[in-house]
């Protein structure tokens, strides 16, 4: 499984136009608030796994008063996040580093909270990552995750077509599978919340945006061919979201 540089610069810029500056996943500040709900983040040390270009980390620092360490597999994303942290005057609260697939490079009990938006979606060996999160958390700490998921039925032709259009590494599972894996890793007070209805409406809005007012910007950034591919990719995603085959959800657990 090779995740190296799946997101090139212009693609990142397009995602920011759709999802907001610094964000490579939907929901913006609202998604960050949902991830941190009930965790008392002020003054806490948070690990953001799959931090991308740092938008969620900056929000956690500015609005929620946390100290944040962000990690990602892709060095260009980390370089951008580090540069933006300096520019925003948040380099004292936010630091970023590139990591490889495998054990997290942190001592046991390093973090009060661990968050992720999509890291488990793109990880085949979810059990190992959950075990690492458990190890890196302090007792009483939380792991809070927002992920793209699947329904229980076999993938349709529409789903296979969307995977082809995406060209990214996905390892989708059902919401109940996440809940079971969190519990198997030793987490307590596990909760799993379906967010599919929320993102169904968001995806429709995003599709209208990229085939409408953002289209000319996409052509300038990506060229005609890639812009049209981007629009078709989003159309294909809306199809599998509308059918209920591609789903979204939150899962949270607490270390004993």
Residue ranges and their predicted role:
Residues 25-42:
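Conserved alpha-helix/loop element of class I SAM-dependent methyltransferases that forms part
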Residues 47, 53-103:
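Class I SAM-dependent methyltransferase SAM/SAH-binding core
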Residues 102-113:
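A short acidic, Gly/Pro-enriched loop at the edge of an enzyme's catalytic core
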Residues 113-125:
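A short SAM/SAH-binding and catalytic strip from SAM-dependent methyltransferases
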Residues 127-142:
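A short glycine-rich, Lys/Arg-flanked "PGG" loop and its adjoining helix->strand segment in the class I
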Residues 148-169:
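Short, glycine-/aromatic-enriched active-site segment of Class I SAM-dependent methyltransferases
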Residues 171-185:
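Short alpha-helix
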Residues 191-256:
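Conserved Class I S-adenosyl-L-methionine
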